[in-house]
């Protein structure tokens, strides 16, 4: 059984990613906070929805730390307009989906990949009456995209479930913060903010 992150050595954590290939690491600095939040769910059959999976770094954290979880990963694997100005990211795009597939291959029985724009996937999941205990939102950073992801995923969240909004305090733009603040205001009677920092985490009441 996987131990809570606080009890894991750096070697064990590194072992989770042995043989994987990543062009970027935008997530690992958030793992201690996520582990603290998820500790009560550690052995439960949690259903997770991830919006924006890139190469699978954060998905692998959830799959390793929550050994009974199932995760649905939504991504176009084509990048977005915000990546146009970064030559390193542009260079990584052609092999993005192949790296995701290779990195997550050993978890095929616990992972569902949906290759689509997030709003399309979220509407389809809603029509299928899918529900999730945890939603991790790391999709588009424009206000419209981030707000749409928040609202559409909220309807898929179980009562007392969590939403983790990544990049809330991103220093390259305020779109996520504006969108998430608007979401929290509009859904003020339905959610409780449990953490506010680089990520903002809310729980459904």
Language-model-detected regions and their locations in the chain:
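A short alpha-helical cap/connector motif
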Residues: 1-205
């Amino acid at each position: 059984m996987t131990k809570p992150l606080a009890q894991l050595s750096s070697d064990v954590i590194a072992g989770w990613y042995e043989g994987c290939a990543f062009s970027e690491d935008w997530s690992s600095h958030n793992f201690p906070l996520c582990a603290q939040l998820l500790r009560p769910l550690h052995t439960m059959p949690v259903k997770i929805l991830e919006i924006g999976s890139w190469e699978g770094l954060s998905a692998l954290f959830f799959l390793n730390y929550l050994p009974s979880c199932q995760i649905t990963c939504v991504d176009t694997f084509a990048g977005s307009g915000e990546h146009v100005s970064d030559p390193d990211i542009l260079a990584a795009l052609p092999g993005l989906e192949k790296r995701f597939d290779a990195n997550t291959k050993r978890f095929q029985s616990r992972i569902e990949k949906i290759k689509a724009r997030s709003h399309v996937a979220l509407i389809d999941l809603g029509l299928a009456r899918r529900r999730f205990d945890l939603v991790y939102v790391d999709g588009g950073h424009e206000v419209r995209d981030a707000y749409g992801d928040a609202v559409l995923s909220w309807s898929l969240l179980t009562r007392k479930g969590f939403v983790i909004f990544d990049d809330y305090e991103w220093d390259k733009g305020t779109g996520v913060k504006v969108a998430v603040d608007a979401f929290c205001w509009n859904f003020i009677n339905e959610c409780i903010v449990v953490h506010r920092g680089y990520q903002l985490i809310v729980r459904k009441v």
